[in-house]
Amino acid sequence: MRTTGIFAAVLFSLALFSPGPGRCDELGESYFPLKAGMRWEYTVTSNQGQPQKLIITNLAPREVNGVKVVPRKWELGGKIFIELMKQDDTGVYRYAEQQGEIAPPSLVTPMEYHLKFPIAQGNSWNMTTKLGNSVLTVGTTIESVSDEVKVPAGTFKDCLKIKQAGENAEGTSILGYEWYAPKVGVVKSMVTIKRKTKEGAASSEQRV
């Protein structure tokens, strides 16, 4: 749930429009496919602007500092962001990231888990993320392993429902939900972001 760079990572609402063509590692691969060539197209909506198209493509594996990772290219609003994903026996996480296709990668510390094993209802973990200049610790919980989700691409059953919530001392807070479908990945994501203004009032953003 990293919000630096051009995308706010998974912190916007999206609905799967057309997806591209079991154990811990098998379950991780099922809910977060990392096969090269897979492609996802989403419609991103926000109360801050017009709907946009987001395309995510898995590229061929490569090495960063001797670690094998899978680059996932995000294309949104004419800009490109690449997250370098790693899966091991602890889960699926963002190991590094890069702004654009030719920029050098930078390591993500601490690691940001998209999924952490075991994949089971009630499993939870924390991660640190940035929202603009604000740093938040976000609690992540698998609330369900059997949700049904309807989006423009169709109806998906047996989805993971993951809740993400965090707030810092500056009054910035996040409440988000993601749904992962077996063999597809994320099919829906939505988030509410609240910030305090200089006058002390709270402003909110709902992306659905």
Label every PLM stretch briefly.
Residues 6-9, 191:
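Short helix-onset patch at the extreme N-terminus, typifying the N->h transition
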Residues 19-23:
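Signal peptide processing junction and immediate N-terminal pro/mature segment
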Residues 1-5:
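Positively charged n-region of N-terminal signal peptides that target proteins for export
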Residues 8-18:
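Bacterial N-terminal signal peptides
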Residues 24-208:
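Conserved functional acidic sites
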